[in-house]
Amino acid sequence: MASPAALRPSMGAIMQTCRSAATAPKVAVAVPVRALSTSAALLKRHKYPTARVTRDNSKQRGESALRKSGTRWKLSVSDEPLPEPVPREELPPIQVDENHGLWDFFYDRETVAMAPLEHTKHGRAWTVSELRKKSWDDLHRLWWVCVKERNRIATANWERTKSELGFGLAEANERDRNVKQTMRGIKHVLTERFYAWEDAVKLAEQDPEIDLSNPENPYTPSTFLEAEETAEGAEASETQSTTTEIDPTTIPSSKSQAEAPRV
């Protein structure tokens, strides 16, 4: 068996070898490192083939008005002077047609809206009983007069709201209410006439003296035809009596009563 003294050199050599291995110089090895970027062009989180495209299509990305970052590229700036506005006093006068139809949308060419007192100067609405007595042409004219009046009221209300005049709106609405009531009465009368016309057509279809297929002369009364036939028969009998020969013996004597022989 070896003595402890004999083992010491071998243990010392082992310890020296381990110490030299632990203190061996390190050699740097270059490892390729991929650059990491947070921009949309370099950052690709999805690697599979069916991954969606995360491309940024915003042309104004990176521009900030708060941070004053500016645009992403330089803009072309020309040295041409900007046009200056012409003063209103130097503008040429605008030619306006004095007889233009749009002037009818205003009550007066000098004012855009009438005073409240002027708006209240109007009559009442037409009643249905009064409109029943009017012809078709009268109702047609009255309807378009009401349309024109409503256009004037709407134009005045628009100008009054735009200019913030603050008056006349209640009076204009009252005037408009009367106009709409008249138009409602016209519709009522025309509806009544239409229903009456439908009833007349149904009765005419059942009347043998009326032929609706003949628009020029649809009514042919039978009494008129009978009277005409009677008149034609009377004329024929009269002509026949004038053409027949007269028997001379049937003619009375032309001698007077004094010359006649006495018995």
UniProtKB/Swiss-Prot annotation:
It is found in: Mitochondrion. InterPro entries: MRP-L47_sf, Ribosomal_uL29_mit. GO terms for molecular function: structural constituent of ribosome. Residues 214-223, 246-257 have a biased composition (Polar residues). Belongs to the universal ribosomal protein uL29 family. This is Large ribosomal subunit protein uL29m. GO terms for cellular component: mitochondrial large ribosomal subunit. Residues 53-66 have a biased composition (Basic and acidic residues). Component of the mitochondrial large ribosomal subunit (mt-LSU). Mature N.crassa 74S mitochondrial ribosomes consist of a small (37S) and a large (54S) subunit. The 37S small subunit contains a 16S ribosomal RNA (16S mt-rRNA) and 32 different proteins. The 54S large subunit contains a 23S rRNA (23S mt-rRNA) and 42 different proteins. Residues 51-92, 208-263 are annotated as: Disordered. Keywords: Mitochondrion, Ribonucleoprotein, Ribosomal protein.
